[in-house]
Amino acid sequence: MAIKDAIEKIVSYFDADEVTDHEDVAKERPVKVQKTEQTPSQQQRKPERPQETVPPRRQHIKSDVQETQVLRSLSLSRSQVNQGSQQMNTTKTTIAIKYPKKYEDAQEIVELLIENECVLIDFQYMLEAQARRCLDFIDGASKVLTGNLQKVGSSMYLLTPINVVVDIEEIGLSHGNQESTFDFDMKRR
């Protein structure tokens, strides 16, 4: 859905019909700004005072300048609206935290990955053998669904869909009282 929304945004951005609509609106605005209501006293003063006549060319230049200023302000406000809509349209990423207690909980975790949600998995409530099986199942599913599984703690893993980038620093996990028993290497015991 995110790809479809992005494509629709790109198409709507380059759509020529919308651009002409905005230009028509911009051309109408200076006309509204230039009109002023005159009170009866102002109307009476006009015949008494000689008006300064501005050559038609200067009037045309002034209207062009005003139109250009309106178009610039419109384009600035449009770019601000586009930036704001891009920020609002960006989907918020939800991270689900799961503490699986049995092997069957792995299916629920994979379903979250299918729905493009990030999952933080903590195996602290599982026995080592069950945790290995569960981790193996989740790792296989993440490969099929083009997800990413990263170890973030001694018993914690972060499962993310393909569109989420995780920038994690390499930290030395303490191997003092807990040996890294939950690892991809299934042969080590």
UniProtKB/Swiss-Prot annotation:
Residues 22-35 have a biased composition (Basic and acidic residues). GO terms for biological process: division septum assembly; FtsZ-dependent cytokinesis. Keywords: Cell cycle, Cell division, Cytoplasm, Septation. Residues 18-64 are annotated as: Disordered. It is found in: Cytoplasm. One of its GO terms (cellular component) is cytoplasm. It comes from the Bacteria. Transmembrane segments: none annotated. Homodimer. Interacts with FtsZ. Belongs to the SepF family. Cell division protein that is part of the divisome complex and is recruited early to the Z-ring. Probably stimulates Z-ring formation, perhaps through the cross-linking of FtsZ protofilaments. Its function overlaps with FtsA. This is Cell division protein SepF. It comes from Streptococcus thermophilus (strain ATCC BAA-250 / LMG 18311).
